[in-house]
Each structure stands twice: as structure tokens, then as C-alpha cells.
């Protein structure tokens, strides 16, 4: 076990508290990214089981991209990365594209996913501003 001097302890505590404060500020966006990620994964699985799966190829591709970028954005914000804003800008762009594509399909899973993608894009734009 490593012992810290009082000044080292205070320095590390201040650093930890700073990260926690930044994470709390980004929590709404992190939550939106996580909800979008989950919706994309669910929608992807459902689309693969639809009878018109061939018509959904672009949607499926975007769902994969959207789920991945939402996960990455959530991770970058959680660790207070200096690149979080750039990742969130990309996330907003991909979420917008995914929302537009999912919106073309009338089934419940695509409509729900489109709505959550729009919310995520909005939160990511706010975070990146």
C-alpha cells in the first residue's frame, strides 16, 4: 500500500473532485448518449428480424455507427477528456443521420430510436458548445 503525504492527498483529491464536477455537468448528455446507445442496439436487432431487412441496410449501418459513437462520447465525457467536445460534435452528426434514416420506417422501434437519436444530438450539441 502506498502512503501519501498530506499535500499529495489534497492534490489528488482536488483532481478527483474536478473530474467528478465536470462529469456531473455532463451527466444529462451522458444519460442521453447511453439511452440512444441502448435504443440503437434494440432497433438494430429488431431491424434484422423485419421482413424488409434489405430495405433497412443503410439504417442498420447507421444504427451500428450511432451506437458506437454514443458509447465513445459517454466514455470521453465520463473521463473528462479534452476531446469530449469534438467527439460530441461527431456524435450529434451521426445521431442526426440515424434519426433521419430510422424516421423513414413506421415501426415502433424505429420511431422510438429516431426520437432518442434526436434528443442525443441536441444534448451533444449543447455539451459541445
Describe the residue ranges of each PLM region:
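Amphipathic alpha-helical hairpins
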Residues: 2-129
Amino acid at each position: 500500500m502506498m502512503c501519501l503525504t498530506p499535500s499529495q492527498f489534497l492534490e489528488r483529491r482536488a483532481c478527483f473532485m474536478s473530474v467528478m464536477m465536470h462529469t456531473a455537468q455532463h451527466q444529462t448528455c451522458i444519460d442521453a448518449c447511453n439511452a440512444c446507445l441502448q435504443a440503437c442496439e434494440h432497433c438494430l436487432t429488431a431491424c434484422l428480424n423485419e421482413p424488409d431487412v434489405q430495405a433497412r441496410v443503410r439504417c442498420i449501418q447507421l444504427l451500428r455507427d450511432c451506437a458506437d459513437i454514443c458509447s465513445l462520447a459517454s466514455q470521453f465525457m465520463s473521463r473528462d477528456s479534452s476531446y469530449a467536445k469534438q467527439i460530441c460534435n461527431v456524435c450529434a452528426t451521426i445521431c442526426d443521420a440515424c434519426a433521419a434514416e430510422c424516421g423513414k420506417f413506421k415501426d415502433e422501434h424505429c420511431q422510438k430510436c429516431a426520437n432518442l437519436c434526436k434528443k442525443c444530438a441536441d444534448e451533444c450539441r449543447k455539451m459541445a458548445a
